[in-house]
């Protein structure tokens, strides 16, 4: 099996790990009911999306 030719330096290791971070979801206020919801998703509180009632309660 192949083995690494050189040891990975601290800088290279840290540069690689800069992308291993948590991402904050894009939260927006629902224009229909005012609850916070994920953008481009149906509102869980009222079931509306783009001004239309998608989820019948």
UniProtKB/Swiss-Prot annotation:
InterPro entries: Ribosomal_bL32 (IPR002677), Ribosomal_bL32_bact (IPR044957), Ribosomal_zn-bd (IPR011332). Keywords: Ribonucleoprotein, Ribosomal protein. One of its GO terms (cellular component) is large ribosomal subunit. One of its GO terms (biological process) is translation. The keyword Membrane does not apply. GO terms for molecular function: structural constituent of ribosome. NCBIfam families: rpmF_bact. PANTHER family: 50S RIBOSOMAL PROTEIN L32, LARGE RIBOSOMAL SUBUNIT PROTEIN BL32. Belongs to the bacterial ribosomal protein bL32 family. This is Large ribosomal subunit protein bL32. The gene is rpmF.
